[in-house]
Structure formats: C-alpha cells, structure tokens
Amino acid sequence: TTTVRFESATVPMARLAALFRTLESNHLTPELTDAVAEVWVRLSATRTEMLLGVDLFHRIEQVPFTDLNPEDKPHQELTVENFVRAGVRLGEEDRAHMATIEAELTALSTSFSRALGTDTRELAVHLGEADELKGLSEDQIAAAATRAGERDESGYLLGLNNFTQQLVLGPLESAATREHVLRNSMARGARGGDGDTRAQVSDITALRALQAKLLGYPSYSSYAIDNQTAGGPDAAADIVSSLIAPANAQLAAELD
C-alpha cells in the first residue's frame, strides 16, 4: 500500500516533467526560458526532498519482497535502489550536502540548456542560393526559406538539431554546404559569450564527482553505470572496444 500510494503521488510530477521536457526540446523560446527554469528547480527540489526522506524510505524498505509477485518484486527493488542512489542512507549532514549538490546541478543543467539553445539559434546556417541546398526535398527547402523569412532575412536558413551529426548532411549534395553545417554544429558551446557552455560542463563534472564520492564510488562513471548491464566503466569500455574491429571491417568492405 505504501509503495502504491508513493507511486500515485509521483504521477503528476512525472507528467509535468515529461511535458516540460518536450517543451524545452522542441518549442522553447526566450520568453519561456525563465518559466521553464523555475519549473525544473521546483521539480528537482520536490524529487530530492522525497528521495532523501528517511521516514518514507523506512516505510518502503519494510515491504517484504517475498510477498510480491514476479512483476511487483523488481519494481519494488528499483524503488528502493532509487532512494539509496539518491543518498537516503547517508548521515544527516551528507544528505543535506547531496540536496545542495542536486539543486546546483539542476541550476547548471538549466543554464547549459539555455546557453546551448542560444548558440544553436545563432549558428543556424544562412545560405543565399537554392543551389546550395541541392539534395534536400522541396518541403525542406521551403521550410528553410520560411525560417529565414521569420528572421527577416533573405535566402534560406538551416536550423541545427540538438545533436552534433546533422540530419541534412546525408541528402545535401554540396560539400561546401555540408562543411558549413557541420562546422557550425561542432562550434556550439565553445565560442565565448552567452552561448558558451564550457563553464557549466566543468562545474557539472566537479559536482558529479563529489556526488559519487559521497556515495562511496571512485568516480561518477562508476556510479552512473553501477546499476547497468555492464556493471562498471572498464567493462563498458571493453564492450565498445570489441566493436572497433568489426566496424572497421564493415567500413572497408563498403568502401571497396
């Protein structure tokens, strides 16, 4: 009953997080930035307070696993694990430290997203001639023209995806245009100014290392992958390394 009530109480928060994650990824505007940031701060604080709640954890931990069916048992185990990984078994002072770290990480993550969004908008690729877009569909070219018009610019504007490898690189026939797109994509976050993310990345890395240390892990990578299939950073690296030779062989075969 305790776990069911706990899960039910978190449903509205999960739905709100999903909504704002979608909004932030696809429809974030400068006007909405502060409101979205405030929502993330409140959601993070609520989640942290919940997962570091010792009394609530003790009630959930009391649920006997032997009485659960095969579907509920792993769910209960995961619920307990989430509390433990958040730091609920730490002493009072360390729990307070973990809460502070989580609040700082949320603020840094929001700042990072804001800066990345700024640079992504500023580095959208402006092109003057339709020939430079050869290979794209008519709809894509029309969308690029519309995007340029929305900024009161002539020609065409290719927006950038959140990830480095851009979707338009495949169909674009112009090597110069492909180079322009990829160069702008890779430049994000490292040009100085409001769109620079290097300070946030550095601070997030330091805080994650401190977080892992408080929880007894040698590194954040060890903490992050501890409950995953690989089980540890070295094992994960071995898995990735084992793919290199087959990938090179496949590449050589395709280039032959």
Which role does the model predict for each range below?
Residues 1-256:
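Zn2+-dependent metallopeptidase catalytic domains
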